[in-house]
Curated annotation (Swiss-Prot):
Cross-referenced CDD domains: ligand_gated_channel
Lineage, broadest ranks: Bacteria, Pseudomonadati, Pseudomonadota, Gammaproteobacteria, Pasteurellales
Topology of this chain in the membrane: Multi-pass membrane protein
Protein name from the UniProt record: TonB-dependent heme receptor A
Domain TBDR beta-barrel residue range list: 168-745
Naturally occurring in which organism (per UniProt): Haemophilus influenzae (strain 86-028NP)
Family designation: Belongs to the TonB-dependent receptor family.
Function description: Heme receptor.
Localization annotation: Cell outer membrane
Highest taxon of source: Bacteria
Length: 745
């Protein structure tokens, strides 16, 4: 009933808007021309010429009509979605590194972290986004303690994205439909601006309702339905020409029955006996959890940029983000879920961040300096609790209520300072930077005495880490067309709470029962070299061609990794040597090398545009992940297969029409740790076959109906069966025809 009412309201307001705008005079300003830019990474943007950076603008985002943020940026070279297609089952992999601590995710500048077992790590609604920036690698002193793979910055929409010149009040309505899972998306916005144009307000809401996805063979990915609601409030206040204050608030909820492991695909069917005993509905739900997920994000930014004072460009930011997942199994579920968060669980991850920095610009003789200095304070909190009804009568398990031993509670505090000087001399830019981090890890004792026995090493005491990171960069503009660059960084990270304080019960058959207070910092040296060629007016007036090539080499040391397999040097040769009685659940492996290359070519003109990209990554550990004392190197399982993308399209500016084709070609992946260590199956992913996917897209803004836009996107045009390697062979989705109709007022 609510959906029917929403549809009627949407159609009514759209028709009213058409009548108000059908006779409006067309705007021929540059902002209207921006609507015609191709739906690819925009090569005209100077920020996209930075080494290692990929940018998706609003038109890219809207044209894809992606269901989740990870799938949205999967088109970028070196960036891959990992996991399956169920709601909340996606993570990111950048150049072969995919752990949550390796990929830093920010929403409007707020750090977001979530590392729940077998779950995704990002829950950002694409409908809210206006821009996504991916900086590959860790080459900036503004970021420390991890993020080796890179930083993904999601930026939400703002009032200026909807208002025309001199417009004081505006609105937005959008309806979307996907054929594969019968998804319906409703988005609406109210935009306000005062007479002085120094205060604006955006209220934005989106609802996403979808059924189960279908595989290419038309079978359903069971329990992949999506019921999601998201809201955004953003205020900009230009207090004076020198002072700007921005507040953004994002809130999202998702509820529904789904498998505990959202990243997985195949769900075992209930037995015929269970169906006869409980009925089909309850029999299925005994294998599921009812998930209640909430995601919050608050950011307050202040900028002070006085006129005629190059020494001050002050920026401060205070942010808070919180993600909660409460899972409940049905009453008739069996009490055997200790390893999957019990019969009920309450999980909360939160991040509190404060950053203040200033950039001073000055000259020393013939060199120009941009000196950045900043301070940071961060607090990451993980609160975990589960209820296991099989332990309800056991005192040593706190009568069923305790923290999962593999997902401990705790806090991590980071205090940091950073400094960078960017020096420009003629056509050379040299940058050097340093960063100091002091980190405090504080564990929380488990409610269950079973996991609080100091005699077997279950110690939740505070552990401190500190150290410096170093950054160097060089960019040489050979001429107007060619730029060469190289970067180097030496950075480190402390263990996250899981790695420091995970334990096992004291009656465990093996000696690996302790927390891991003896862990050392994980170190990495990162190097990249490359070049950028930019040619303007190549074939016709106002066209642009850009070619970029990058090679990177990452050398990691003291990799923090779970202790399984060979537990001590004494039995490294698989002898019967007895190890010490207390061994931590995590240890430092000797090291690894990840290297690769990216080739990118983009062309855009008034009428034609296209792109070709290619990314290649390979990586090896010095030893087996299960035997750090071995002499045989092994492939790293999380390295993605080679990927190439291509796109070709055209614009008809007279009719505000854009259409094109995009394809993705993925090689097979058969490199596995098993080839170096046949017993390393636990750390391996199934081999995958290569595949190609073809998509079509179309965008049209009728000239006579100002503010209206129609988009059509067809994913997997040929309904090709495929199983992405990083999805652990979870099936891809079948052909999906996406349609959206939007109206700005």
């Amino acid at each position: 009933m609510n959906i029917l009412i929403n549809k009627r309201i949407f159609l009514l307001v759209t028709l009213v808007g058409i009548q108000l705008n059908v006779t409006a005079k067309q705007n021929s300003s540059n902002s209207n021309r921006e609507e015609l830019l191709p739906i690819i990474v925009n090569t005209n943007d100077d920020s996209n010429k930075l080494p290692g950076r990929s940018v998706l603008k609003q038109k890219n985002i809207e044209q894809q009509q992606a269901d989740n943020a990870a799938n949205l940026i999967n088109i970028l070279p070196g960036v891959n979605m990992a996991g399956g297609f169920r709601p909340g089952g996606q993570t990111l992999n950048i150049n072969g590194m995919g752990d949550a601590e390796d990929v830093r995710v920010q929403l409007d500048g707020a750090t977001k972290s979530f590392e729940k077992y077998q779950q995704g790590s990002i829950f950002i609604e694409p409908e809210l986004l206006r821009r996504v920036t991916v900086d590959k690698g860790n080459y900036s002193p503004q970021y420390g303690n991890g993020g080796f793979a890179g930083t993904v910055k999601f930026e939400t929409k703002a009032a200026r994205d909807f208002l025309q010149e001199n417009q004081k009040i505006g609105g937005f309505l959008k309806y979307g439909n996907n054929s594969n899972n019968n998804q319906k998306t409703y988005s609406t916005a109210l935009v306000l601006q005062n007479e002085q144009k120094n205060i604006d307000l955006l209220l934005f809401g989106s609802v996403r309702n979808a059924g189960d996805y279908k595989r290419p063979d038309n079978s359903k990915i069971l329990f992949s339905k999506n019921n999601q609601k998201t809201g955004l409030i953003k205020v900009n206040w230009q207090i004076s020409p020198e002072h700007l204050l921005t507040l953004s608030s994002v809130y999202g909820i998702h509820k529904g029955w789904e498998p505990f492991a959202a990243k997985r695909d195949i769900l075992p069917k209930p037995s015929s006996g269970d169906i006869m005993r409980y009925g089909a509905d309850i029999a299925w739900k005994r294998k599921l959890v009812y998930r209640d997920q909430k995601d919050k994000n608050y950011t307050l930014k202040y900028n002070y940029l006085p006129e005629n004072n190059p020494w001050i460009n002050l920026s401060t930011q205070f942010s808070y983000s919180k993600t909660t997942q409460n899972d409940t199994r049905p009453e008739k579920a069996p009490p055997v879920f200790l390893g999957t968060l019990g019969n009920q669980s309450w999980i909360t991850y939160s991040d509190l961040t404060f950053d203040i920095n200033n950039t001073s610009t000055f000259n020393i003789k013939s060199t120009r300096h941009e000196l950045l200095f900043g301070l940071q304070w961060l607090k990451n909190t993980r609160n975990t609790l589960m209820y296991d009804k099989s332990k309800v009568k056991k005192e040593d398990y706190n009568y069923g209520y305790f923290q999962p031993y593999y997902m401990p509670s705790g806090r991590q505090y980071t205090q940091a300072l950073y400094l960078q000087d960017q020096i420009t001399w003629k056509n050379i830019i040299f940058s050097t930077g340093v960063r100091y981090d002091h980190i405090n890890n504080i564990g929380q004792k488990n409610f269950a005495p079973q996991y609080n026995d100091i005699s077997v090493g279950q110690n939740y005491s505070q552990k401190n880490y500190n150290g410096w990171s170093y950054y160097l960069g060089l960019k040489y503009d050979v001429n107007h067309y060619l730029s060469l660059f190289t970067n180097f960084s030496r950075t480190w990270r402390a263990p996250v709470i899981d790695e420091q304080y995970e334990t096992q019960y004291k009656q465990s058959s093996g000696p690996v029962t302790a927390t891991s207070l003896n862990l050392e910092k994980e170190m990495i040296n990162q190097t990249r070299v490359g070049g950028i060629i930019t040619l303007n007016h190549l074939f016709q007036e106002n066209d642009v061609f850009q070619f970029r090539t990058t090679y990177f080499y990452n050398r990691g040391k003291n990799e923090i990794f779970k202790t399984r397999g060979v537990n001590c040097v004494g039995n490294a040769a698989d002898t019967n040597h007895v190890c010490p009685k207390i061994i931590g659940n995590y240890r430092n492996l000797p090291g690894y090398v990840i290297q690769g290359a990216e080739l990118e070519a983009y062309y855009q003109s008034t009428y034609l545009f296209g792109e070709i990209t290619y990314s290649y990554v390979k990586g090896k550990r010095d030893t087996s992940p299960r035997n750090p004392w071995g002499k045989t190197s092994t492939w790293i399982a999380e390295i993605p297969p080679r990927k190439a993308t291509t796109a070709l399209g055209f614009n008809i500016p007279k009719y505000n029409f854009t259409a094109g084709w995009r394809a993705e070609f993925v090689r097979r992946q058969d490199r596995s740790p098993l080839s170096g260590d046949p017993e390393a199956k636990y750390w391996s992913l199934p081999a995958s076959r290569g595949y190609s996917l073809h998509n079509l897209f179309l965008s049209w803004s009728p000239a006579k109906i100002k503010g209206m836009n129609i988009k059509i996107t067809v994913d997997n045009l040929f309904n090709r069966a495929y199983n992405p390697y990083l999805g652990e062979l979870a099936s891809g989705t079948g052909r999906n025809i996406k349609f959206s109709l939007s109206q700005k007022f």
